[in-house]
Amino acid sequence: MPAQPAQENAQDADDAQANATMETRVAGQGQPKRVGRWTLAQLRQTDGIIPSQAGWNKGDSQKLMTNFGTPRNTQTRVKSENLAEIPEEVLMRTHGEVRLQSGTNKFESQRGMTGFGTGRDVCREGVHVNQAPSDLQPLDEEKIRLSDGIVRLQAGTNKYDSQKGMTGFGTARRETTKMTDSKHPDYDHERPDQSEIPLQAGTNKFASQKGMIGFGTSRRETTKICDSAHPEYDPESSIDSSTIPSQMGSNKYASQKGMTGFGQPRWEVLDPSISWQNRKSQGMVRLQSGTNRFASQQGMTGFGTPRNTTYEAEAGELPYEDMKKSETVIPSQAGWNRGDSQKGMTGFGAPRDVKGKHLKRIWELEYPEEAEASLDRL
């Protein structure tokens, strides 16, 4: 009997350890670590609990929950006081069934089904469909190739079809209405002519291009008015195809005599020796742009060479020493730096000193104390 209280005390100690919470104690002190008014153990008790504003999952369990992506069973999970509870073994029977909202595959079988992506063979005769492929007699290669141009039944069949009466590739389809045309009883809608526009787009039958102008010719839509100054002028009959109407000017009595061909440059020259037939004049500039006849490039410098205006001004040859002296001189056309000096100039990138004499004088008048102090330093 004395051993029983000892066992009870040990069991109480185990229960106390199972329900114990983690506490962080500070070395040298017996008090648990606090965060504000709460201990760390008290704060960690709610780590696995969703706060109330998001709902409450305390005491909840995921028992009997389906996996991710499993459709919800809305047939057996209905809670109602009028319905009897379904036993567990009955519930487990429906796990392999598709729910009624998606249809049902109960009593279904995949027997005889082909693999995924396998084409369906619907060309076999009905009496041989149930035979296994191993029981079928092999076909000759000639018989197999006879069906290469046949579309299978699942897509329809083109057997005994013909392209008779079909139009060529890219030809627009003419879906004409099958009706009786009282005005044109000889017109057959089933076999329209290639040169005729079908009726749904209008028709050009009996049409003519008589009186039509050529391609690219501008249309002359003149106003039908009576010209009191020229009563003989008729807008409908007076306009000739070769005459420009008066509103754009007139080319009446005009001539193209002496005109050059299309795209040919005009030669406004007075010298008959300059001609496109004379190869000697191919390098000449025509008079309308000036002329370079008898011109020469003698004494011209190369491309990019600066002009030496000093040499041209003196009109003589310079010695080698004098030519070297003028290499640092900017010619007159760009200005003149002769006699200049860089004395007092700052280095490259140095800020400019804008405190000139005028600004310094204003500064001395406004700040005399600082001006005297600067003079004392000197």
Curated annotation (Swiss-Prot):
Name of the protein in its database record = Calponin homolog OV9M
**Species of provenance:** Onchocerca volvulus
What protein family is recorded? Answer: Belongs to the calponin family.
| GO BP of this protein | actin filament organization
Q: In which tissues is it expressed?
A: Found in the longitudinal muscles below the hypodermis.
Q: What is the lineage of its organism?
A: Eukaryota, Metazoa, Ecdysozoa, Nematoda, Chromadorea
Q: Which PANTHER family match?
A: CALPONIN (PTHR47385), PROTEIN UNC-87 (PTHR47385:SF11)
Q: What else is known?
A: There are apparently several forms of the native protein which appear to be expressed in a stage-specific manner.
Kindly indicate whether the keyword Repeat belongs to this entry. Answer: yes
